[in-house]
Amino acid sequence: MNVLDNSVIIKGSKNGITVFLDEEMPFEELLENVSDKFKNASKFFNNATMAISFDGRNLSAEEEKRILNVISDVSELNIVCVLDENNDIKSVYEEAVKKAMNSFNISHQPERQKITDPKTTCMFYKGTLRSGQVFEADGSVVVLGDVNPGGKVVAKGSVIVLGSLKGNIFAGVDGNENAFVVALEMSPMQIKIGDIIARSSDSGVNKISKGKNKSKILEPKIAYVYDQNIYVEDLEQNALDDISLD
C-alpha cells in the first residue's frame, strides 16, 4: 500500500504542479496509479489551468503523452505546458507572446495581411479575473489564468489568455484594429477590437458563438478584425509556422 501511495506524488508549486513518479515501478502500473491519483484529486483541482512538470523518473515523449492523456481523461485540469527543471515559466510565456506579437498569418485568409501588433509593451497578469474585476494595460497583456463571466480585460494592444476566456475583452482601445485576441478556450461574453464588437449572442459562422459541447481538449483560437467583422478561427500549427522572430 505504501508503494502505491508513494509511487505518484502531486505537489503544488508557484508555476503549477509537479508530479513525482516512482523510478522503478513498471510504466503500465505507474500509469494506473497516475489515473487513480488524479481521479481522487479531480474535485480539488476542478478545471484549473496550470503548467505541469515531472520529477523522479526520466520519461520518453510517448510516456509523457500517455500520462497527459490519462490526466485529461480523469480530471478537468487544463494543462498549459509541460516544464522541465531548466524551464523558467516566465521565459516560456514571454517567448510565446513574443512570437504571437510579431505576426499571425491566418491560414484561411491568404489574401489578408499578417496581423501585427505595434505595441512593444506586454504585461502579465497571473490569476483568475472574476466577475466585477477589471485589468487594464497600456500595451498588450497575457493573462496566466481564466477570465470568468463578468471579468474584463482592457488593453491598448492585443490580449492572450492562457486559460478559459468567458468574460469580456477590449483590445486595441485606441482604435487599433490590428490587435487580436488569443485564448486556449474561447467562449467570451463579448470581444471588442478597436471599434468592432462581437457578442456571444451574435449569429453568423464568422462571429463568436458559445460551444455546445465542451471538450476537455483545449482548442486555442484567435479573434481578429477583417472587413469590419470579428472572425474567430482555430490557432493551427500552419499559422504558427509562419511566425518569425525579429
Curated annotation (Swiss-Prot):
GO biological process assignments: cell morphogenesis; division septum assembly; regulation of cell septum assembly
HAMAP family tied to this protein: MinC (MF_00267)
Keywords assigned: Cell cycle, Cell division, Septation
Organism: Lachnospira eligens (strain ATCC 27750 / DSM 3376 / VPI C15-48 / C15-B4)
Cross-referenced InterPro entries: CAP/MinC_C, MinC, MinC_C_sf, MinC_N_1, Septum_form_inhib_MinC_C
Keyword Kinase: no
Domain of life: Bacteria
NCBIfam families, per the entry: minC (TIGR01222)
Family: Belongs to the MinC family.
Record text on subunit structure and interactions: Interacts with MinD and FtsZ.
Any one Pfam family match given in the protein's UniProt record, by short name: MinC_N_1
Disulfide bond annotation, renumbered to this chain: none
Name of this chain's protein: Probable septum site-determining protein MinC
Stated role: Cell division inhibitor that blocks the formation of polar Z ring septums. Rapidly oscillates between the poles of the cell to destabilize FtsZ filaments that have formed before they mature into polar Z rings. Prevents FtsZ polymerization.
